[in-house]
Curated annotation (Swiss-Prot):
Keywords: Chloroplast, Plastid, Ribonucleoprotein, Ribosomal protein, RNA-binding, rRNA-binding
UniProt protein name: Small ribosomal subunit protein uS3c
Domain of life: Eukaryota
GO molecular function: rRNA binding; structural constituent of ribosome
InterPro entries in the record: KH_dom-like_a/b, KH_dom_type_2, KH_sf_prok-type, Ribosomal_S3_C_sf, Ribosomal_uS3_bac-typ, Ribosomal_uS3_C, Ribosomal_uS3_CS
Organism per entry: Tupiella akineta (Green alga)
Cross-referenced Pfam families: Ribosomal_S3_C
Subunit structure, interactors included: Part of the 30S ribosomal subunit.
């Protein structure tokens, strides 16, 4: 019986890097992992149309706030997005508000455990070739399917956009009650090569869900960018 492994975790240290870059004591590790997840989930939920490709989180050593003289944990959050304007807005005040909202998100849990408060440093970076990202392709399909566009038409539109990204291969799978069918099924399409068993293959992967009037549809995208030597 075939066993499946996550395409990104399978290639960590070869073609993929960790999304969270920090070290911690064994006792603090679970809490910090959950804190990272909370920050990421909040950003993806708050900016669904920003086409966020990736969020990298780095943590510095605990330092002292110059004004309050209290200990603070500094967290660097780098957001890679295709549409920076959706996050930045028209003024710098938007970024300040975002930083404050993210700090408040973690503040209550830290107070319960008597831990230092956090200071977030935000960096927003524009991605030049967004449709080479599996996450952006999945977001585009979600938008189409939630607007009741037939799944085959949505796949065709997505493949047209992917051609401009010059990927070496793409595989897309959609599962659920497709076009409102009584029985759920899976449909997939593949263009080019997608060598999932080759470790040196630079493959981006994303799995997301679309909420339609017929129920939830699962979307999986594998994007093959080439082999690393």
């Amino acid at each position: 019986m075939g066993q499946k492994i996550h395409p990104l975790g399978f290639r960590l240290g070869i073609t993929q890097e960790h999304r969270s870059k920090w070290y911690a004591k064994a006792s603090d590790y679970p809490r910090l992992v959950l804190e990272d997840k909370k920050l990421r989930d909040n950003l993806f939920k708050q900016y669904p149309k920003a086409n966020i490709v990736d969020i990298i989180i780095k943590r510095r050593q605990t330092t002292q706030d110059l004004e309050t003289k209290e200990s603070v944990d500094v967290i660097e959050v780098s957001i890679y997005t295709a549409v920076p304007g959706k996050i930045i807005g028209r003024s710098k005040a938007t970024i300040t508000e975002l930083k404050e909202s993210l700090e408040k998100l973690c503040q209550l849990d830290r107070m319960k455990h008597n831990l230092p408060q956090i200071r977030i440093i935000l960096t927003i970076l524009k991605v030049q070739n967004p449709y080479s990202s599996a996450s952006v392709i999945a977001d585009y399909l979600i938008e189409q399917l939630e607007q009741r566009i037939p799944f085959r038409a949505a796949l065709k539109k997505a493949l047209e956009r992917i051609r401009l990204a010059k990927l070496e291969g793409i595989k897309i799978e959609i599962s659920g009650r497709l076009n409102g069918a009584e029985i759920a099924r899976s449909e997939w399409v593949r263009k080019g090569r997608v060598p999932l068993q080759t470790l040196r293959a630079d493959i981006d992967y994303s799995a997301k869900t679309a909420k339609t009037i017929y129920g939830i549809l699962g979307i999986k995208v594998w994007a093959f960018k080439g082999e690393r030597t």
